Amino acid sequence: MNAAVGLGLLFLLAGYFVPQTCERKGPRRFLRERWTRIGVPLVVFAFAANLPIALAVEQPASFGGFVGSLYDDAWRPLYLHLWFLGHLMLYSAAYVTWRRFSGRAPHSWPTPGHRSILAFTLGLVGVTWVIRWWYSVDEWVPLLWVVPAEPARLPQYVSLFVLGAMAYRGDWLRTMPSGVGRTWLGVGLAASLCMVAVQMLAPDSSRYNQLANGGLGWPSVVRSGLEGLVCAGLAVGVLVVVQDLVHRPLRLVSAMAATSYAAYILHVYIVVPIQASIAEPDVSPFLKFSVVAVLAVLLSFGAAHLSGRVPGIRRLLGTGPPRVPEATSS
């Protein structure tokens, strides 16, 4: 479920904010600040945290062989969850490059209706299915030789980033009719229930996580189709419905939003030890999941909040107080 919509939503929102930020700051300053905000934390955590962890786990006989094994695994042990930041850097650079060489004024895209959303969904399903003829789910490659990428899900991530930029140009989040959002929220929830039903009720060989990870057959079509419906349905529905319901931010939500980036970077280093500590007790998996989820959220956001009190870390994670521009004397 997370792969079907969670990360896609993050790329959609990231794409939404790129055009306005780039235009306000200019391409050079935009890329420079994006490197400071995204690239520097990625490099620091990759080499200061993830690399020692990978070395401790692998215990390689030679460093050269270790580097080769990292490349064969698409650098994933070096990036871990931070591959998302690598993609944001690439997509941001691609946007700036496109704006630089397209030579066209920004275009305002009309708000999509049911037909446009359905056409996008069918196109996403088709492209995803075709790519999975060659690349199965959870098969990773080093994109441009340096960034881990999962081709089976790349169409979703790239297309939603592009749609986010288009949504900003057309002011879709404000002009999207509530009825369209509610309808597609229903579509996304229905497809999600189908995923759960296939996983829980189908025979072992046909459960969702064992349903063809790729190939030409109908199981791959079913999986690609369900993921496409969940992605489009919830991406449209959640954003529109939440905007209708929440007219002013709650203090807790605002505080969490301010530290969400830091919490994302830190959460893996918190979640994995918690999972390992409760792996042995013979208790309900649902209870284990609930305990890990609650503790992970509390500790991740707590650590992100506390990072704002450590000078070097708060600069790295962006959790320091916002800078107030100096007033110019007349």
Which residues does each PLM region occupy?
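Alpha-helical transmembrane segments and their immediate juxtamembrane cytosolic regions
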Residues: 1-330
